[in-house]
C-alpha cells in the first residue's frame, strides 16, 4: 500500500517542526522522524488508527496516535492519504 500526504498535512508537519525547533532543534527532528515512522506502519496495518466517528464513513477515515501527535488519514483501495497532522493539545481539525 502506498502512502501520500495532502498539501495540508505537509504544511502541518512543517508547522509542527518549526514550532518545536524554536526551543529544541534535535527534538523537532526526532518528532518529525517519529511521525513519519508511525505513518509508515499504515502500509502494513492500514486499520491501525481509530475510526473518526463524526466522519461520513468512519471505517475509512481514521486517526493514528503517535506519541502526542495525531495523523488523520483516509484509506483507499491501494493508498493511504494522510489528511492532517496535529498535536493533541491543538484544537481538533
Q: What residue spans do the PLM features occupy?
A:
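Enriched for short, Lys/Arg-rich terminal
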Residues: 66-93
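Basic, Lys/Arg-enriched alpha-helical interface segments
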Residues: 2-60
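Absolute protein N-terminus
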Residues: 1-2, 93
Amino acid at each position: 500500500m502506498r502512502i501520500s500526504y495532502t498539501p495540508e498535512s505537509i504544511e502541518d508537519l512543517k508547522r509542527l517542526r518549526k514550532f518545536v525547533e524554536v526551543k529544541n532543534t534535535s527534538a523537532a527532528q526526532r518528532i518529525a522522524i517519529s511521525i513519519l515512522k508511525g505513518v509508515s506502519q499504515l502500509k502494513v496495518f492500514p486499520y491501525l488508527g481509530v475510526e473518526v466517528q463524526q466522519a461520513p464513513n468512519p471505517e475509512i477515515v481514521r486517526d493514528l496516535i503517535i506519541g502526542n501527535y495525531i495523523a488523520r488519514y483516509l484509506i483507499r483501495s491501494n493508498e493511504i492519504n494522510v489528511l492532517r497532522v496535529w498535536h493533541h493539545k491543538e484544537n481538533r481539525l
